[in-house]
C-alpha cells in the first residue's frame, strides 16, 4: 500500500487578533478584502457566538466588555516564515481594520497565552452551548461551506430557521 500526503507547511510566526464589528453584514462585507490581504485564518463569530463566548472564563475584554446586539467578530491570523513577512502582513491587516466600523479596539498579538485565549473562545463555543442545553435536547453541530457572496444571506436564513423552530443559542 502507498499513500501520498499533501501537507501544508506550518509557518513558525503567527499573530492573531479579534476584529469585532457592529453587524454580521459588516463582518461579511469585510471578508473579500481580508481574503485578498492573504490572511491565513478568518473565523466568523455571530452575535449568538459572542454571547456564549462572554460566559467563557478566559474570554478577552473585546468580548466581555461588549453589550452584544447584532455584533459579529472575525478571528484573524497572519502566518509568516520571517519577521519581515509577519510585519508586512500585520501592517496590511491593521490598515484594513482601521477602515472598518469596529465595535471594539483591535490589536494583534504574538503572545502565546493571548492567542490561546482567542482560540479557546472559538473552540469553546460548541461545548459551552451543548452544556447549557436543556436536558433531553440535542446540540447540533454542522460545518457548512458557502461562497463568500452567499455567506450573509445563508447566515440570516439559518438564524430565521432557528428562531422559527425555537432552537435557541445556535452557534
Question: Where on the chain are the PLM-derived regions?
Answer:
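Noncatalytic alpha-helical scaffold of FAD-dependent oxidoreductases
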Residues: 1-171
Amino acid at each position: 500500500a502507498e499513500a501520498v500526503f499533501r501537507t501544508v507547511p506550518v509557518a513558525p510566526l503567527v499573530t492573531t487578533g479579534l476584529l469585532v464589528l457592529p453587524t454580521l453584514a459588516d463582518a461579511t462585507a469585510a471578508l473579500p478584502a481580508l481574503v485578498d490581504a492573504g490572511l491565513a485564518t478568518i473565523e466568523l463569530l455571530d452575535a449568538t457566538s459572542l454571547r456564549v463566548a462572554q460566559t467563557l472564563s478566559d474570554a478577552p475584554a473585546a468580548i466581555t466588555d461588549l453589550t452584544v446586539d447584532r455584533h459579529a467578530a472575525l478571528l484573524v491570523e497572519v502566518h509568516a516564515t520571517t519577521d519581515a513577512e509577519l510585519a508586512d502582513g500585520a501592517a496590511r491587516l491593521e490598515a484594513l481594520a482601521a477602515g472598518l466600523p469596529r465595535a471594539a479596539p483591535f490589536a494583534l498579538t504574538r503572545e502565546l497565552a493571548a492567542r490561546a485565549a482567542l482560540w479557546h473562545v472559538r473552540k469553546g463555543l460548541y461545548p459551552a452551548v451543548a452544556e447549557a442545553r436543556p436536558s433531553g435536547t440535542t446540540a447540533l453541530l454542522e460545518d457548512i461551506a458557502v461562497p463568500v457572496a452567499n455567506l450573509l444571506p445563508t447566515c440570516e436564513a439559518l438564524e430565521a430557521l432557528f428562531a422559527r423552530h425555537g432552537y435557541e443559542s445556535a452557534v
